[in-house]
C-alpha cells in the first residue's frame, strides 16, 4: 500500500490541515466534513452494513466488551452519529446511569435520536451537539468515553484527545474505534482497490454521493497509524494504553485510562 499518510498533523502549518488528500484551511475542513455527513446521514446505517458486510457490528460489540461499563455510570458516546453504541450503553447503565450521544453534526444527531426513540430507548439518553475539541462538560465527569469512526474527521486530534482526557473521571477509560492501517501487505492491496474503486461506486448507487465516500477512503489513509495514535493518547495524558488490531488492522481499537 502506498503510504500517503503524512501522519496526523505533521508537515502542516498551524492554519491548515488535511481534508482527505487535500490540504485546506482548518475552518474549511470543518465546513467540508459537515457537508459530507449532512449528505450521508440518511443512508449512513445502510452504507455501514454494505461497506463492512455487517462486521462493524462485531467491532462495536468488542468496543462495548472492552469498555467495562457498569450500571449507574455516565458514558459519553462522542461522534456517536446514529447511536449504535449509545443503544447498547443505555441498556448497560440502566435507569440510574446516563448516556450522552454527542455529535458535531446535527443531521447525524437527528437520525440517531429518531432511531433510538423509535426503538424505545428513552429516559437515560441525552443528545448534545458538541465539538470534540471543546467538549461542553465538567471536568472528571464521565466513567467511559467512546469515539467510534469519528476521530479521523476531527480537525485537531490532539486537542480533542486533551478535551476527552479533561472530562473523563480518574479511573475512567477512553476507547477509540477507528479505521487504521492493515498489518498484512496482501490485505493492504485488496483494501486499497476496494476503498478507492468500489467504495465510491457503492456510495453513488446507494447514497447518490460518490464524493463523500471517496473522502472516506482518503480520510482513512491520512489518519495516524496504530502506534502513532497510541503515542498521541499518551501525550494527551492517557496511561496503560493499548490497541487491538481488528480484521487484520483494517480497524483498530485503542484503549487508555486516566489515573
Swiss-Prot record:
Record's keyword terms, sorted: Menaquinone biosynthesis, Methyltransferase, S-adenosyl-L-methionine, Transferase, Ubiquinone biosynthesis
GO molecular function terms listed in the Swiss-Prot or TrEMBL record: 2-methoxy-6-polyprenyl-1,4-benzoquinol methyltransferase activity; demethylmenaquinone methyltransferase activity
EC number: 2.1.1.163, 2.1.1.201
Domain of life: Bacteria
Listed pathway(s): Quinol/quinone metabolism; menaquinone biosynthesis; menaquinol from 1,4-dihydroxy-2-naphthoate: step 2/2; Cofactor biosynthesis; ubiquinone biosynthesis
SUPFAM superfamilies: S-adenosyl-L-methionine-dependent methyltransferases (SSF53335)
CDD domains noted in UniProt: AdoMet_MTases
Protein name, per record: Ubiquinone/menaquinone biosynthesis C-methyltransferase UbiE
The gene coding this protein: ubiE
Amino acid at each position: 500500500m502506498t503510504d500517503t499518510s503524512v501522519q496526523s498533523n505533521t508537515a502542516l502549518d498551524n492554519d491548515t490541515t488535511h481534508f482527505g488528500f487535500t490540504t485546506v484551511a482548518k475552518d474549511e475542513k470543518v465546513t467540508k466534513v459537515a457537508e459530507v455527513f449532512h449528505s450521508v446521514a440518511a443512508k449512513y446505517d445502510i452504507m455501514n452494513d454494505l461497506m463492512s458486510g455487517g462486521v462493524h457490528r462485531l467491532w462495536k460489540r468488542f468496543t462495548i466488551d472492552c469498555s467495562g461499563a457498569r450500571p449507574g455510570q455516565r458514558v459519553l458516546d462522542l461522534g456517536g452519529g446514529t447511536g449504535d453504541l449509545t443503544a447498547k450503553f443505555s441498556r448497560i447503565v440502566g435507569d440510574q446511569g446516563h448516556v450522552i450521544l454527542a455529535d458535531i453534526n446535527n443531521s447525524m444527531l437527528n437520525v440517531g435520536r429518531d432511531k433510538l426513540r423509535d426503538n424505545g430507548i428513552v429516559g437515560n439518553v441525552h443528545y448534545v451537539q458538541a465539538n470534540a475539541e471543546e467538549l461542553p462538560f465538567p471536568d472528571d465527569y464521565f466513567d467511559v468515553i467512546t469515539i467510534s469512526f469519528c476521530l479521523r474527521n476531527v480537525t485537531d486530534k490532539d486537542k480533542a484527545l486533551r478535551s476527552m482526557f479533561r472530562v473523563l473521571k480518574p479511573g475512567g477509560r477512553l476507547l477509540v474505534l477507528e479505521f487504521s492501517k492493515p498489518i498484512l501487505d496482501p490485505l493492504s492491496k485488496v483494501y486499497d482497490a476496494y476503498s478507492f474503486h468500489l467504495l465510491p461506486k457503492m456510495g453513488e448507487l446507494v447514497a447518490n454521493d460518490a464524493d463523500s465516500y471517496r473522502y472516506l477512503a482518503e480520510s482513512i489513509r491520512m489518519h495516524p497509524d496504530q502506534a502513532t495514535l497510541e503515542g498521541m493518547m499518551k501525550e494527551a495524558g492517557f496511561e496503560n494504553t493499548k490497541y487491538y488490531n481488528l480484521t487484520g488492522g483494517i480497524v483498530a481499537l485503542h484503549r487508555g485510562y486516566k489515573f
